[in-house]
């Protein structure tokens, strides 16, 4: 009986062993633990932000520099003074001139007795210095002054000329009965005739004009008819280092010669066999531009005198020299209150060289030659 128990117990033990063996030694292999893998999260592709396009920096527009309306020269401040025209003695016994070297424009023309006289125009009379010698008024001087809204300066005039002046309404300063003028005693002592001794300082003329209640400010709305360029040498012009201006009227002749001086950059003024120099400074009278206005000149008998009066309204032909070259041009003046304007023969505007101008009023019989 004990034997049976033993066998039964053995069977139980063997069964248990099989169970435990299956549990203890039979772990199924497992894959090692791994961290979960993640794909990188990417945002939708976007373009990098860009700055809006910017325009290239631009320089602010520069204000045009103020210029002298009669010469085109750059000046420090806007010119606001009214122009002055001065009647200049030009007969040989009256020379040398004073102050013509400072004129912006200088007109020469027959006036009476087949002699010429000058009309010097200044945009800045206050700084013109001593001017003269000053002589009496002539018809065309009033005419030109009116066209440029200028105050005309003179030493009297005949009854007919003074009547014409009053009719024109042009403001004037008369050295015979107004202040601002002086007689040069040194000239008188050295033998000059009295009529060749009257002078005035520009600043004194300005003061006298103000004293008399004349408007002394420039009409800034007025077009003075001139355009300028740094180099006014005319394209296609003929060589003209010397321009000989033989003013001829009724068989009488007066010659002015303009000689180009490259060092001075303009034409020196020669007459009576001499180069004109300033009586105060000794400097040569020199002009960047030489203009010849060809027109009809008539004799007019008035107050017992014979005057030479040029037709300065309308249009006509002429010449222009600058930089050693010369061309034919046209001139125009539309009325008594208008200045001169100049064009090429094809009608395009003429550009003058920056600087002063000598202008000859030439009767139609005149001879203009150059070389």
Protein language model regions, located:
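Bacterial N-terminal signal peptides that target proteins for export
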Residues: 1-9
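C-terminal motif of bacterial Sec signal peptides marking the signal peptidase cleavage site
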Residues: 19-22
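Intrinsically disordered, low-complexity serine/threonine-rich repeat tracts
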Residues: 29-62, 67
């Amino acid at each position: 009986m004990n034997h049976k128990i033993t066998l039964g117990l053995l069977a139980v033990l063997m069964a248990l062993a099989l169970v435990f063996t299956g549990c203890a030694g039979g772990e199924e292999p497992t894959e090692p633990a791994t961290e979960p893998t993640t794909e990188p999260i990417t945002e939708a592709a976007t373009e990098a932000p860009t700055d809006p396009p910017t325009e290239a920096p631009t320089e602010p527009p520069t204000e045009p520099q103020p210029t002298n309306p009669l010469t085109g020269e750059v000046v420090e401040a806007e010119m606001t003074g009214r122009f002055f025209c001065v009647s200049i003695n030009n007969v040989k016994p009256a020379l040398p001139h004073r102050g013509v070297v400072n004129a912006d424009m200088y007109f020469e023309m027959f006036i009476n007795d087949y002699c010429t006289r000058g009309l010097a125009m200044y945009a800045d009379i206050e700084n013109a210095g001593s001017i003269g010698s000053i002589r009496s008024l002539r018809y065309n001087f009033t005419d030109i002054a009116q066209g440029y809204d200028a105050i005309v300066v003179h030493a009297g005039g005949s009854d007919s000329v003074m009547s014409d002046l009053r009719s024109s309404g042009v403001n004037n300063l008369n050295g015979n009965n107004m202040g601002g003028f002086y007689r040069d005693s040194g000239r008188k002592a050295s033998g000059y005739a009295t009529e060749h001794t009257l002078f005035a300082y520009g600043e004194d003329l300005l003061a006298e004009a103000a004293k008399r209640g004349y408007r002394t400010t420039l009409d800034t709305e007025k077009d003075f008819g001139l355009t300028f360029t740094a180099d006014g040498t005319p394209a296609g012009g003929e060589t003209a280092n010397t321009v000989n201006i033989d003013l001829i009227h009724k068989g009488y002749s007066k010659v002015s010669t303009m000689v180009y001086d490259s060092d001075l950059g303009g034409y020196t003024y020669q007459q009576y066999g001499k180069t004109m120099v300033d009586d105060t400074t000794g400097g040569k009278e020199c002009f960047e531009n030489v203009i010849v206005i060809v027109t009809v000149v008539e004799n007019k008998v008035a107050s017992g005198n014979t005057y030479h009066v040029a037709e300065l309204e309308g249009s006509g032909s002429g010449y222009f020299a600058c930089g050693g070259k010369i061309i034919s041009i046209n001139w125009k003046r539309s009325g008594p209150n208008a200045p001169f304007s100049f064009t090429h023969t094809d009608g395009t505007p003429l550009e003058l060289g920056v600087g002063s101008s000598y202008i000859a009023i030439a009767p139609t019989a005149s001879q203009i030659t150059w070389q």
